[in-house]
A protein has these predicted regions:
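Bacterial N-terminal signal peptides that target proteins for export
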Residues: 1-10
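Extracellular/lumen-exposed scaffold segments
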Residues: 21-163
């Protein structure tokens, strides 16, 4: 009997620390970090800059692509607002990864890890405004391998200095 209780105690001592310190699986879209940057952040009139919105997803979480293969999935979509007079070029979404998940019968097109959405902002030569804020509104649906979470919209702000 003492030998049996020692074995049980040893198993508990070995398993308990791993359970206490293990990172929990992603539970919602709030686990997706969204950030943005403009490079360079200073621009002369008559020039363009590249802006990037980055979605950083932890392991175990993915986001639907901008063109999901199932009509019931919500596409990732970025809307961009700039100061009056600046122009936004076409938005370039990353190439999705094709995955077969537990809840899907067919492959789904998703973004995993780090996904970068890019677009150009042009300041015309006759631009009369000053520096300004570029605002992105990113709508996406995050999922894990078992289920999808309700869609969310995140706002990203980037500053552009016009010289």
């Amino acid at each position: 009997m003492i030998k049996h209780s020692r074995i049980v105690s040893l198993i508990i001592l070995l398993v308990l620390p791993a359970t206490l310190y293990s990172k929990p699986a992603p539970q919602s879209a709030s686990d997706v970090n969204v950030s943005g940057a403009v490079a360079p952040d200073k621009i002369k009139k008559g020039r363009s800059v590249r802006a990037t919105v980055v979605m950083d997803m932890p392991n175990g979480l993915h986001v639907q692509s901008n063109k999901p293969l199932d009509k019931f999935l919500v596409p990732t979509k970025l809307d961009v607002e700039t100061p009056s007079g600046m122009n936004v070029g076409p938005i370039s979404y990353p190439r999705p990864v094709m995955r077969k998940l537990k809840f899907s019968k067919a492959n789904v097109a998703v973004y995993e890890g780090k996904a970068m959405i890019r677009f150009n902002v042009t300041v015309p030569a006759n631009y009369s405004g000053g520096s300004g804020e570029i605002k992105g509104k990113l709508r996406f649906q995050a999922c894990n391998d078992d289920s999808c979470f309700p869609p969310v919209t995140r706002e990203v702000k980037m500053w552009l200095n016009v010289e």
